[in-house]
Amino acid sequence: MEGPEIQFSEAVIDNGRFGKRVIRFETGRLAKQAAGAAMVYIDEDTALLSATTAGKHPREGFDFFPLTVDVEERMYAAGRIPGSFFRREGRPSTEAILACRLMDRPLRPAFIKGLRNEVQIVVTVLAINPDELYDVVAINASSMSTQLSGLPFSGPIGGVRVALVADEHGSQWVAFPKHSQLENSVFNMVVAGRVAGDDVAIMMVEAEATDNSWNLIKEQGATAPTEEVVSEGLEAAKPFIKALCDAQADLAARAAKPTVEFPVFLDYEDDAYAAVEAAAAEKLAAVFQIADKQERDAASDQLKDDVTSSLAGQFEGREKELSAAFRSVTKHVVRQRILKDQIRIDGRGLTDIRQLTAEVEVLPRVHGSAIFERGETQIMGVTTLNMLKMEQQIDSLSPVTRKRYMHNYNFPPYSTGETGRVGSPKRREIGHGALAERALVPVLPSREEFPYAIRQVSEALSSNGSTSMGSVCASTLSMLNAGVPLKAAVAGIAMGLVSDQVDGQTRYAALTDILGAEDAFGDMDFKVAGTSEFVTAIQLDTKLDGIPASVLAAALKQAREARLHILEVINSAIDTPDELSEFAPRVIAVKIPVDKIGEVIGPKGKMINQIQEDTGADISIEDDGTVYIGATNGPSADAARSAINAIANPQVPEIGERYLGTVVKTTTFGAFISLTPGKDGLLHISELRKIAGGKRVDNVEDVVSVGQKIQVEITKIDDRGKLSLSPVIAEEEGAENAEVAEAAAE
């Protein structure tokens, strides 16, 4: 875009051998009636417009800052027409909602405290390269437009995604990676922060291991995202954030409006705080030593009523100030006790975890279920399995068009003992579900290993701190109960942070397994999920202007100790996948030649419909010739497989068939027998006893050797088409072998 009115600045992001990215900030041409507007480009082929506006008057009756952040995904940005019935954009996609949360979380603490004018930030995706991710660009765009708007905002704020990408030269943290680069990465994180002196203070982190992480680490030797590696990633993000903040500051210095003086409504005046502190501080210290949440809340509410009633005459008409001051005094009392005495609200030490319980198979008929409890937080996880054609279809700007693992999180009002609206999920529920989903994706089996669509639902039945991390634990239990062969168990823990001035110095205390009150009164909610070996997901929210990376690194190490303890509890409840529920569908995969797909389908679908009608199975065929067969029971699935093989794979072996095979390989656990070209089966070492006349076989080579011909029968075909064999022994030969074995024994 060109024009004499345009002013711009650029941030050049140097990724070394992975090339450079250019982030360009422009203003002056578009959305001129907004308080602040900015166009932000990445490499000139992805463009976002951010506009910030503010209400002219404070919102009456509001005791919070009314900030709204929205993302408008335009399908024309990717050269597409929306897939909805009316062919226009409707409600925001999940990706857009998550992008809104990414922007809101670092921006909100940067506005002046007490602002009550409504502020709205709208980011519109105008053009996008399908290989780009726009969410981090949106963080910078929203910060830039707000910097230009004249609002009391302590920016700029820079946001960057860094991915640990592996290539032939090793692993490197790459800024602003593309979708194609993420396929070779083991971990990626979105980090937002601001320049604080000579350092960068971190304000928000959203991180995850990728679905390829396990294979890259275990099979290709890629660097695992341990706590130390993740800490290095936070440090690697700092210079990129500084470059983005410098570019924003440069443009703001030339084009920003003067900061407007907005009315600020402080929660209370100093005299109200002093009066409440004198009346309540000592009693609050005793109240917040009560361990039980409901008893503690009742005592706190009673004390609040007593204090406000006693001070009502002195502060007539200022009851709201007294209420806010009471909360502030409570916060100070709780924080000082933690920092000075190292004792928390419920009497725990800084690193102590509440009592844990884990139970599986808690509901009848469902495919998998579990309950995980951590103190007063109780999560029920329920797993449902179905054919892959039931996976979620996605119509968004992302190149990802389908998702086989779907995690839904529900937070009903009764979970906190309150009343409220129930129904469609709110942004918070969508965000928590997405976090739990990201934590578990790296350990899911591949589509080939487990050809099922998986829907996981987390029901927050009781909440007192970190239901999202409880959902991760409950989901691990539930999926194992459903028979999902997870590569490893995953657990999550919520860390908190308290900081305050003690004896003239700023002290930090990291808290393990925070309560709801510690979340409310603390400075940070830091959620960490992972296996026993590495981190799979992180989410950081802070109420401060930023947190030193060294403090976060220490909290990461503290979280690992807690995670390992929780994994022990999970493993004591269930450590291996159970058998599939009798109520779960049986899904098997058959590979057919691509040129046989038409024959299986038949003219106008006649053949495939006939097979489905005859067997009761449900059949779907992929373009690569993979056929997925789903049925309510095993015999139906086997009948459909036989019918398909009769058409497309007439030489495919069936159970009970006999072959004269050739030993092609021996191992410690048996011998592989070639039956037909391209089709082998396993003759397990336990089956070799029949050849040895019932004698125990310790060494496979003592009985068979490579190249030997042997008559075998197919005894089993598993869901992946692998064959189990048994030797066919004539009666005379079997008797003779038995006599030889007896003679050898004598």
Swiss-Prot record:
EC number: 2.7.7.8
Compartments it resides in: Cytoplasm
Molecular function per GO: 3'-5'-RNA exonuclease activity; magnesium ion binding; polyribonucleotide nucleotidyltransferase activity; RNA binding
Homology family: Belongs to the polyribonucleotide nucleotidyltransferase family.
Cofactor dependence: Mg(2+)
Catalytic activity: RNA(n+1) + phosphate = RNA(n) + a ribonucleoside 5'-diphosphate
InterPro entries referenced in this protein's UniProt entry, alphabetically: ExoRNase_PH_dom1, ExoRNase_PH_dom2_sf, GPSI/PNP, KH_dom, KH_dom_type_1, KH_dom_type_1_sf, NA-bd_OB-fold, PNPase
Residue ranges of every copy of the S1 motif domain listed in the record: 656-728
Top EC category: transferase
Record's protein name: Polyribonucleotide nucleotidyltransferase
Record-linked SMART domains: KH, S1
Keywords from the UniProt entry: Cytoplasm, Magnesium, Metal-binding, Nucleotidyltransferase, RNA-binding, Transferase
PROSITE patterns: KH_TYPE_1, S1
GO biological process, one term: RNA processing
Function according to Swiss-Prot or TrEMBL: Involved in mRNA degradation. Catalyzes the phosphorolysis of single-stranded polyribonucleotides processively in the 3'- to 5'-direction.
Residue stretches making up the KH domain: 585-644
GO-annotated cellular components: cytosol
Sites where the protein binds Mg(2+): D519, D525
Gene3D superfamilies in UniProt: GHMP Kinase, N-terminal domain (3.30.230.70), K Homology domain, type 1 (3.30.1370.10), Nucleic acid-binding proteins (2.40.50.140)
Disulfide bonds: none
